[in-house]
Amino acid sequence: MNNIKTGVVLARLHPIHNGHLELIEQACDENDQVFIFIGSADKFNQRNPIPINLRKQLAEEALEELAKRYLTGVIPADVHIVPLDDLTDESDNSHDWGFYLFTKILKEADTPYFTIYYSDGFEIITTWFPSFVMRNNVSLKLIARGATCSGISATKVRKMILDGDDEELKKWVPQCVYDCRETLKKHIQLANMIK
């Protein structure tokens, strides 16, 4: 077993918001390396309206903003952003999905031991992996969605963008997302035309 502590954040980032950043910051504070897997990388629909290249770019820019919070100006972990296609569909919580995710993490992180940082229900993650994997390889750090930034969600952020609620939006997203709101609005509007 290696001594490098590895954290994994799995999120779709449609778009990245301050709740995601709280989760990422905690993972960075507690690990040597952090892998941010951007899920549903291969999807474009109402639930997944922002192309993966833009989500990845905004995540990178948000991390640059996050680094400024540290005295050194550097995030204390080695951070990697990795697009992750869905295995079947995003509601798949089977062991097949768990093994798919596990092998992707193993390939990227080069370790079978990691902590997943997540803000949805505990029961969801426990359905992904057989008990022996949970017991031997995977630790969980669950942060209640309501506990991160007063329960902000990407769905709420997208609504603020569509409604042009710039004042409220500015409170909940990194500056890079706020600055990109018109481009994001066009992607969201286009995706909303798809039935």
Regions found by a protein language model. Give the residues of each.
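Nucleotidyltransferase catalytic core that binds NTPs
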Residues: M1-K195
